[in-house]
Regions:
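FIC/Doc superfamily catalytic core
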Residues: 11, 16-284
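Single conserved hydrophobic/aromatic residue that forms the stacking wall/gate
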Residues: 1-12
Length: 284
């Protein structure tokens, strides 16, 4: 039985075709036949009102940013995502690295992490925002994003592939599923259920929290989750969530751990929405 059993409604049924192709051990998913699903509520009433404020506000629109603002957004987003992982680069050092290719005398892995994040973020931004495209968030996109984020940081055999061994998450007693079949089954469920969330903010939170909790890869799971969250927002022409404040990094972690341990979205959803509202009000 999967460690995720408590998160799945009793009426959820997922049938898998075991004869489906499984090329490359774990990269191509078996076909899933979804019999019935019940949608979990992500936002409470107050959060729904905040979400509507964000969706209706012109300052939330990604397409209204100028090219220099786009670059600044990419830098601060990468700094934010890296800092959550314990990256030691300061904001100034991150900016020098990503804009001017000036490397600080710090760990190679820290610079590589930030460059991978930046290149992936910019690539998605250009495809969606500049190219006026929608990025389909499916397993192929997820594997591609993870591979781009983790290149040079994990082995080639584990970059862009589902993990085949157990992982632990610091700061929580929650243990992600260990069995490849359970990981694969839950991932198919997550990617299917996202379609039920027509509110792009809810969809972004749903994808972020559930992919992070599943930990489908050997490393880089939260980075991948934040990138997928951002892609879901970009698809809706919404500026992704970011912060450079230490207190926000702490609140992000608290919100995610609360979801790991209880399945309750409210703490992370509150953080996510409040960051969007604060950013809008700061520049109004």
């Amino acid at each position: 039985q999967s460690d995720w059993s408590s998160d799945v409604c009793s009426s959820d049924l997922l049938a898998f075709n075991n004869d489906s192709p499984n090329i490359g051990n774990n990269k191509i998913q078996p076909q899933a036949t979804i019999v019935f699903m019940i949608m979990e509520q992500i936002f409470n009433k107050e959060q729904q009102e905040k979400a509507q404020f964000i969706l209706n506000h012109p300052l939330a629109r990604l397409s209204d940013l100028h090219s220099n603002e786009i670059k600044d957004l990419a830098v601060v987003w990468c700094y934010y995502s890296g800092k959550i992982e314990g990256n030691t680069y300061t904001y100034v050092e991150t900016e020098a690295l990503l804009k001017d290719d000036i490397t600080s005398e710090k760990k190679y892995e820290d610079a590589k992490m930030l460059k991978n994040l930046y290149n992936t973020f910019i690539s998605e931004l250009e495809y969606i925002n500049k190219g006026k495209n929608q990025e389909v968030i499916d397993e192929r996109t997820l594997f591609r994003v993870h591979q781009a984020i983790s290149t040079g940081l994990v082995s080639d055999e584990e970059s862009g592939y589902l993990r085949t061994r157990g992982v632990r998450i610091s700061g929580t007693a929650y243990i992600p599923p260990k069995n490849l079949h359970d990981i694969r089954a839950k991932l198919n469920e997550i990617l299917y259920q996202q379609e039920q969330y027509t509110n792009p903010l809810e969809r972004a939170v749903y994808l972020h929290c559930n992919i992070a909790k599943l930990q489908p890869f050997i490393d880089g799971n939260k980075r991948t989750s934040r990138m997928v969250e951002s892609i879901a927002l970009m698809n809706a022409d919404i500026i992704p969530v970011y912060s450079s404040k230490d207190a926000d990094i702490l609140n992000y972690r608290k919100g995610l751990i609360a979801f790991y341990e209880t399945g309750d979205y409210s703490f992370y959803a509150g953080y996510f929405l409040d960051k969007q509202v604060e950013r809008i009000k700061e520049i109004e």
